[in-house]
Each structure stands twice: as C-alpha cells, then as structure tokens.
A protein has these predicted regions:
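Hydrophobic ligand-binding cavity/cleft-lining segments
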Residues: 1-44
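Intrinsic-disorder/low-complexity, polar/charged segments enriched in Ser/Thr/Lys/Arg/Asp/Glu/Gln
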Residues: 14-18, 55, 65, 100
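Hydrophobic/aromatic beta-strand elements that line small-molecule binding cavities or substrate pockets
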Residues: 19, 68-72, 88-94
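Hydrophobic pocket/interface hotspot
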Residues: 28, 38, 56, 70, ...
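Glycine-rich portal/gate segments that line the openings of hydrophobic small-molecule binding cavities
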Residues: 36-85
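Mature, Sec-exported extracytoplasmic domains of Gram-positive
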Residues: 43, 85-87, 91, 137, ...
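Beta-strand/loop substructures that line and gate deep hydrophobic ligand-binding cavities in soluble
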Residues: 80-132
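Short, highly charged C-terminal tails/helix-capping segments
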Residues: 132-158
Length: 158
C-alpha cells in the first residue's frame, strides 16, 4: 500500500492511500459501497440511502448514529462522503482481475482525533485486502497505537 500526505496548510491536506486489490471492480465496489460489504470490514457503518445526497450511517453502539452525506456516487468507480468535517473518497480503477483503490481523506479540519481516523482507515484498507485474498487480518492495540503515532507525527509535523 502506498501512502502520501499532501499538506496544504498547518490544518489542511489530503491523506492518500493507494492499494491494488485482488478482485474485479464490481466485487470491490460491493465491499466499499453496500451495507453488506461494510459489515465485513467496518461493521459500524451502513448505507442508509445510496446516491448523491444519500446517507452513510455510523453506529456508535449506544443507539446513537452519526449521519454522513454522500457527496459523490458513481457506481462502480466513485464513492465520497462527509466524515465529520472532512471528506473521504474511494476511487476504483478497473485492472481486469485486480482493482486499484485510491482512498483519500481530505482534511479541512485537523484535530487531535484525525490521526486516529487515519490509522483506522489504514487498518480498514488492509482488512479489505485480506477479505479479497481470503485471509484474516487483525490488529493488536499496540499495532494501532504505532499507526496512530506515525500519523500524528506526519500530520502535525511543522
């Protein structure tokens, strides 16, 4: 997985991950853009309503949900939605038997929680890869904290 942080200001930038996935574009689309797909790698998320201005729902597990608005939806190549004050974007490029997934979190409001989100997305992308390769991917708390520290240093470096 390749990663790049395009810093624009002290508080804004784009965190980009690019990963080649085993699987055709429709299979990958179904993993990243449907409730059934999310259940496999990010079970707290469901699709309330697909399409532009539709909703992605984040279940806090206590009966409360956060709604994120879908801002771009072009099956099977593009899904973009609000993520707190930022935006996440999944772009798929068909390579036949494989698919390139380019994930971007556009950071317009950098907070102390943002590195935690980026570390989480890093792990989610590895889970997606594992699902498509029929292998289990799990992380320890120490592995998560190492990723968190890495992205905290990257996002907040002067």
């Amino acid at each position: 997985m390749q990663e790049t942080y395009n810093k624009q200001t002290d508080k804004t930038g784009d965190m980009i991950f690019e990963i080649e996935l085993k699987g055709d574009i429709e299979t990958v689309w179904n993993l990243i853009a449907t409730t059934k797909g999310f259940e496999q790698w990010f079970p707290e998320i469901s699709v309330g309503e697909p399409g532009v201005n539709g909703l992605i729902l984040f279940d806090f597990g206590d009966g409360q949900y956060e709604e994120s608005t879908i801002t771009a939806y072009e099956p099977p190549t593009l899904l973009q939605y609000d993520w707190d004050k930022n935006t996440v974007r999944f772009e798929l490029t068909d390579q036949g038997d494989t698919t390139i997934l380019t994930f971007t979190e556009s950071i317009v409001h950098l907070t102390t929680h943002t590195p935690r989100d980026i570390a989480g997305w890093h792990m989610c992308l590895q889970r997606i890869q594992g699902i498509l390769e029929s292998r289990e991917v799990s992380f320890t708390e120490d592995e998560f904290l190492a990723l968190f520290d890495k992205y905290q240093a990257l996002l907040f470096e002067k």
